[in-house]
């Protein structure tokens, strides 16, 4: 079953996530109006969930359609569709912005992602912006995958409401897939290098510190836990390892330097350490392109 309750259940809302609400949605709130301001006000929201992108669009939004296995966007037009089957019944009118947030691109197989990109390029108009987020290959969540080639070897089970199959990506790999589809790559931006998955345990690398849980505790007014000051175990040699080790050291210094500060203040200081990288080092990797 693809469209029913059984298929949608793994992707259903997993409960309140204070880190996402406080920090990650803030970044999306900056992104969506900028995209609409640059390309136009018609937005196709791929994997729309509860319609967050539509709510964050503000006055720049002129037309909206959300696609999801089980849409929950009250008051916004949506269609129930599985993006693994392609773009779906979105009508003939092109959109100005095609947006897929929170790792949606990694929930498709490499072949399914390529098919979706081709269909987006055909549906959009010249100049339509395409902003799709994948899971970053060089995330601290899975250093054992850093040297793994794209394809079946890199496809792993990932826990949401239940296990789903995901495929992390490097930016250069996605740039090439955009080009093959007729979409000019414009840039890449990492999201959430420090906080990792919503679950506190790691299935892929036991050295992953539960930073997300530590930030959530700070936002609740609790003191900083060990996860926020611990150093990282050894990682595969290379720039991703140096970046992640340096970020952990900066986080430790920030916590020790802010001793006595309130939990939310310290959480903001830690989040401010997020570097403006685009190399696939974060939990999320956003690729921006333009239909040629």
Residue ranges and their predicted role:
Residues 50-86:
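Class I SAM-dependent methyltransferase SAM/SAH-binding core
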Residues 89-98:
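A short acidic, Gly/Pro-enriched loop at the edge of an enzyme's catalytic core
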Residues 182-224, 230, 242:
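Conserved catalytic loop of SAM-dependent methyltransferase domains
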Residues 163-183:
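Short alpha-helix
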Residues 1-37, 40-49, 129-154:
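Conserved class I S-adenosyl-L-methionine
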Residues 114-129:
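A short glycine-rich, Lys/Arg-flanked "PGG" loop and its adjoining helix->strand segment in the class I
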């Amino acid at each position: 079953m693809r469209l029913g309750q059984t298929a949608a259940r793994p992707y259903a809302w997993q409960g309140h996530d204070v880190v996402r609400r406080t920090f990650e949605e803030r970044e999306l709130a900056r992104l969506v109006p900028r995209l609409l301001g640059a390309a136009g006000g018609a937005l196709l929201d791929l994997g729309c969930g509860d319609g967050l992108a539509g709510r964050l669009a503000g006055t720049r939004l002129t037309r909206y359609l959300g696609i999801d296995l089980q849409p929950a966007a009250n008051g916004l037009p949506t269609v129930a569709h599985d993006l693994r089957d392609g773009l779906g019944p979105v009508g003939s009118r092109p959109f100005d912005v095609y947006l897929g947030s929170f790792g949606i691109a990694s929930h498709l197989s490499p072949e399914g992602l390529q098919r979706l990109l081709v269909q987006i390029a055909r549906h959009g108009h010249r100049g339509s912006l395409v902003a799709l987020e994948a899971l970053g290959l060089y995330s601290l969540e899975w250093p054992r995958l850093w040297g793994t080639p794209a394809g079946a070897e890199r496809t792993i089970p990932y826990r949401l409401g239940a296990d789903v199959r995901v495929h992390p990506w490097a930016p250069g790999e996605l740039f090439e897939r955009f080009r093959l589809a007729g979409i000019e790559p414009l840039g890449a931006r990492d999201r959430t290098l420090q906080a990792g998955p919503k679950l506190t345990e790691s299935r892929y690398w036991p050295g992953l510190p539960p930073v997300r849980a530590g930030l959530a505790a700070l936002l609740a007014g609790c003191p900083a836990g060990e996860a926020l000051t611990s150093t990282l175990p050894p990682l595969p040699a290379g720039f991703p390892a140096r970046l992640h080790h340096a970020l952990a050291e900066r986080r430790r210094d920030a916590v020790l330097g802010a001793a006595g500060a309130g939990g939310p203040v310290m959480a903001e200081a830690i989040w401010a350490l997020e570097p403006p990288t685009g190399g696939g080092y974060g939990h999320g990797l956003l690729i921006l392109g333009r239909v040629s």
